[in-house]
């Protein structure tokens, strides 16, 4: 029963981390690519 309580919290935390990390990596990658293309 304890595992069932922890599992949804871990899933929500995993989704939140990836939901924030993916756009951040894409944002930083696009900025570095634009600066690299400008030079």
From Swiss-Prot:
InterPro entries xrefs: PSII_cyt_b559_bsu, PSII_cyt_b559_CS, PSII_cyt_b559_N
Amino acids binding heme: 18
Keyword Transferase tagged: no
Subcellular location: Plastid, Chloroplast thylakoid membrane
Principal location class: plastid
BP terms from Gene Ontology: photosynthetic electron transport chain
GO cellular component: chloroplast thylakoid membrane; photosystem II reaction center
One example GO MF annotation: heme binding
Cofactor mode of binding and number, as noted: With its partner (PsbE) binds heme. PSII binds additional chlorophylls, carotenoids and specific lipids.
Lipid bilayer topology: Single-pass membrane protein
One Pfam family per UniProt: Cytochrom_B559
This protein's UniProt keywords: Chloroplast, Electron transport, Heme, Iron, Membrane, Metal-binding, Photosynthesis, Photosystem II, Plastid, Thylakoid, Transmembrane, Transmembrane helix, Transport
Transmembrane parts of this sequence: 14-30
Role noted for this protein: This b-type cytochrome is tightly associated with the reaction center of photosystem II (PSII). PSII is a light-driven water:plastoquinone oxidoreductase that uses light energy to abstract electrons from H(2)O, generating O(2) and a proton gradient subsequently used for ATP formation. It consists of a core antenna complex that captures photons, and an electron transfer chain that converts photonic excitation into a charge separation.
Protein family (similarity comment): Belongs to the PsbE/PsbF family.
Assembly and oligomerization: Heterodimer of an alpha subunit and a beta subunit. PSII is composed of 1 copy each of membrane proteins PsbA, PsbB, PsbC, PsbD, PsbE, PsbF, PsbH, PsbI, PsbJ, PsbK, PsbL, PsbM, PsbT, PsbX, PsbY, PsbZ, Psb30/Ycf12, at least 3 peripheral proteins of the oxygen-evolving complex and a large number of cofactors. It forms dimeric complexes.
HAMAP family for this protein: PSII_PsbF
Protein name (Swiss-Prot/TrEMBL): Cytochrome b559 subunit beta
